[in-house]
Swiss-Prot record:
Pathway: Purine metabolism; IMP biosynthesis via de novo pathway; 5-amino-1-(5-phospho-D-ribosyl)imidazole from N(2)-formyl-N(1)-(5-phospho-D-ribosyl)glycinamide: step 2/2
InterPro entries xrefs: PurM-like_C_dom (IPR010918), PurM-like_C_sf (IPR036676), PurM-like_N (IPR016188), PurM-like_N_sf (IPR036921), PurM_cligase (IPR004733)
One Gene Ontology cellular component annotation held by this UniProt entry: cytosol
Subcellular location: Cytoplasm
Record's protein name: Phosphoribosylformylglycinamidine cyclo-ligase
Gene designation: purM
Length: 345
């Protein structure tokens, strides 16, 4: 009788050595994001982080998100170095709207066969996003799962925890008629609406490499999500912010009402900004109705801030000094009965 061939985990499609190589490759990216509150080093069973001592009544704020089908485009066009920024942005931008300073971030990277070079590029991007937001990358999970993903496909998820002083939580309760609305420009579609983006590319049979305003269309589509944390933390400290809305999935119609009292509505001046070219291209080539555009995409507006009207000039000056493109986009008005909570004029 012949002796059965001994099997290893690698024979089953899981390469532990590749995982170890990845950990070695990302150490510099992780170290760059370290905050003084972080305890211990990468590789422990659990990651430890103290709450900053400046907080008297700290409230932890958490969020989790992914990059959605933007990953499909990134994988197809081998653009792996910025999807990590997208991942962090989608989480930390959700935290900042409640006034929370991001503390730490963890990522989950899942694939059928671990490509160390690709994974290193992705995690380095996560490190860059954490650096941009002042958030420590303190841990994560790399799951190599043969038979679960096809070819070079992978998926990402992120989890972030931030902290805010209990008395300083921004929850929209101070919003009142007469408040002004300031918009902060997006860098592109960010990480929302990409199933529709891909459908437009399919139906129009457009060449993703075609020129659009001086650079390939695909570069517009894969532009990383803008991170607003540092500029908005400064604005929160300097001004009286009543509410903030991160314009993500659901666009204007779904996200702005999340931070408004029932008796208030947002009146948006649709002519106060010009849509970036990529949104006009999507609308034209997909024959998408304007209502659907505002429901699916940010249309050039990544964040909306509600604040007293007499604080607008100072806020715009501060944001400009921080490198943000911002403008007065509308105002809060009294809402009657079952009126829609968002009007775009």
């Amino acid at each position: 009788m012949s002796t059965p061939t001994p099997l290893s985990y690698k024979d089953a499609g899981v390469d532990i050595d590749a995982g170890n190589a990845l950990v070695s490759n990302i150490k510099a990216a992780v170290k760059r994001t370290r905050r003084p509150e972080v305890m211990g080093n990468l590789g422990g069973f659990g990651a430890l982080c103290e709450i900053p001592t400046k907080y008297k009544q700290p409230v932890l704020v958490s969020g989790t998100d992914g990059v959605g089908t933007k990953l499909r485009l990134a994988i197809d066009y081998k653009k792996h170095d910025t999807v990590g920024i997208d991942l962090v942005a989608m989480c930390v931008n959700d935290l900042i709207v409640q006034g929370a300073e991001p503390l730490f971030f963890l990522d989950y990277y899942a694939t059928g066969k671990l490509d160390v070079e690709t994974a290193t590029s992705v995690v380095n991007g996560i490190g860059e996003g954490c650096f941009q937001s002042g958030c420590a990358l303190i841990g994560g999970e790399t799951a190599e799962m043969p038979g679960m993903y096809e070819g070079e496909d992978y998926d990402l998820a992120g989890f972030c925890v931030g902290v805010v002083e209990k008395a300083d939580i921004i929850d929209g309760s101070k919003v009142a008629a007469g408040d002004a609305l300031i918009a902060l420009a997006s860098s592109g579609p960010h990480s929302n609406g990409y199933s529709l983006v891909r459908k437009v590319l399919e139906v129009s049979q457009a060449d993703p490499q075609q020129d659009l305003n001086g650079k390939p269309l695909i570069e517009h589509l894969l532009e990383p999500t803008k991170i607003y944390v540092k500029s908005l933390l400064k604005l929160i400290e300097a001004s009286d912010i009543h509410a903030m809305a991160h314009i993500t999935g659901g666009g204007f119609w779904e996200n702005i009402p999340r931070v408004l009292p029932d008796n208030c509505k947002a009146v948006i001046q649709g002519d106060s900004w010009q849509w970036p070219a990529v949104f006009s291209w999507l609308m034209e080539n997909g024959n998408i109705a304007q209502y659907e555009m505002y429901r699916t995409f940010n249309c050039g507006v990544g964040m909306i801030v509600a604040l007293p009207a007499d604080k607008v000039d100072a806020a715009l000056a501060l944001l400009a000094a921080e490198g943000e493109q911002a403008w007065l986009i509308g105002a809060i008005a009294h809402r009657e009965g079952n009126e829609e909570q968002v009007e775009i004029l």
